[in-house]
Amino acid sequence: MISIRIPAQVILFLTVAFLLTQCKSKGDEQTHLGPTGDPTIDALTESIRENPSDPGLYLQRAQLFYDHQAYDQAIEDLARVMKLDSTHLRAHHLLADVYLDHNQSAMALKTLQRAPALYPDSIRTKLKLSEFQLILKQYDAAYQTLADIMKIKPGDPEALFMLGMVYRDQGKTEQAIAAFQSAVERNPDMSEAWVILGDLMDRTHDPRAIQYFDNAIRVDPGNVAAWHAKAYFLQNNDRIDEALEIYKKIHELDMQYPEAYLNSAILLLYRDSIDAAMKELLILRQIDPTNAAAWFYSGKAHQFKGEKENAKAAFEQALRLDDTYDQARDALRELDE
């Protein structure tokens, strides 16, 4: 059998042609799109009418459509970008994101697989490709992509970080720790890597885990996930007062962060500080009325106070929100006994 290698540019042309064929009639509508109600999108549409050959305008509008989860419209605009500039790297990256969020993972991967052929030395593109390969559980392909990056830039910290992510996803804890440690050695400002390292150390019952959380906070004092990870470590090691103080700190950093309210409420219930717990749960229910756990623990708080009817109503609401919530079902049964 004779194998014919098709140049990347030809593949890209065929893909762009396919995209444009699929949305040609819609694409014409996109150029002459009527008012959408979004002033920024409408302003870009007017600019496109005046400058229909400017790929940057289509790209900006595609980003806005993507932000609004209008995926089909985003794809159509990105097809226009690629027709005007078939090697537009940012358009490739955005198109892959759109496809992935639009539940078209195969198209997302194909889009990113084309980009390295056009930009073989783009580390950013290869990193994004490895991320998508990880999402799709294509571990061997991800390893190969990361190896390609190491050939271009040996010891690249972001590639080492992604290597750790792949190892972690496969349950290879020791290799993951080694990869993340190598990443932070080369770039100590990688807050997320410090958090993950702390979590992995905690899983192995290594008391040094808290040092990694502290490093993450030192690098990025506003990283709520780092503060939360430290608080969770403390509460799991019976350092309740310290954990509660950190949850207060998280409230200051992000008043809309639900986990801090839930965890602090549970700890307060554990401490028999029922009224304080109920205040936390009330805020949580206001932030996220569909949070079944908030209603369940509200029910427990009412139960501890002897308020049976209020407890029953809260447990029932938890079950309405999540009919698989066995703890709420068991709690209701206990109330009836």
Language model features with spans:
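Helix-start (N-cap) detector for alpha-helical repeat units in TPR-like alpha-solenoids
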Residues: 55-56, 89-90, 123-124, 157-158, ...
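Position-specific recognition of the canonical hydrophobic site in helix A of tetratricopeptide repeat
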Residues: 66, 93, 100, 127, ...
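Structural marker of alpha-solenoid helical repeat scaffolds
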Residues: 50, 84, 118-119, 152, ...
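N-terminal leader/linker segments that initiate helical-solenoid repeat arrays
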Residues: 20-79, 83-85, 101, 110, ...
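Structural signature of tandem alpha-helical TPR/SEL1-like repeats
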Residues: 34-43, 69-80, 102-114, 136-148, ...
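Terminal, low-structured helical/coil segments at or just beyond the last alpha-helical repeat
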Residues: 26-30, 35, 270, 293-296, ...
